[in-house]
Amino acid sequence: MRVRWLAAALCALGALTLAGCDSKIGTAAVVNGSKISESDVSRYLDPSADDASGARSTALQYQIEQKVLTTALRGKNALPSDEDLAKGHDQALSNLFNGQLSGDAANQALAKVLGQNGLKASFGEVLIRTVELENAYSEAINASQAQDAVAELAKQHIPVSVNPRYGSWNAQSFTFTGLGSKQLPSVVTLGTTLPGDVKSSNSQ
């Protein structure tokens, strides 16, 4: 059974050490000693967008999540190869739309949503890889529920630090405050719960 747990998992209550990011110029975030540069973030931003602030934080958020998941999987000697992860590409893409779209239709819809929110279509591959890693981690620990994955991830104490210029970092949901359905409304409408929506989804 597939578990879409990342929306809730990365709050982890102690799994992450959050602090002001290294002040070195060009650093957006550091995950377990691995740097995410500002150029890693800006490469996914649409230069024609009116307001890049939300897109910038979204681009960084998912790159952080990828590194956390990669570190967690490696710690369990369960990190799949890029080739093995890619085998789940089409299913991960469809899962972004809760199974309601797939193939070219899903690719086109995702590119449109990203463009409407200041992100290049190439950022879609970041989202898809994040879902692939979510699936791999859930399978690695045989998680049947989101809270099982949260508890297991918390045991690894993966350190994360973030440059505050990217927004207000929420240590409870492991997201930038305000991200979620506001950034990718069409995807959420189709059924996906994004990380920024964790509190509202849990309170219902």
Describe the function of each predicted region:
Residues 37, 106, 133, 145-146:
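Alpha-helical structural motif
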Residues 1-55, 155-204:
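Short, low-structural-confidence N-terminal segments
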Residues 138-165:
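Acidic/polar surface patches and capping/hinge elements
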Residues 70, 133-139:
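Short, hydrophobic/amphipathic alpha-helical patches that form generic packing surfaces
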Residues 83-86, 94, 98-112, 116-130, ...:
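Cell-envelope/extracellular anchoring and linker segments
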Residues 22-120:
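N-terminal targeting/tethering segments
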Residues 6, 12-14, 110, 115, ...:
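Terminal low-complexity, poorly structured segments
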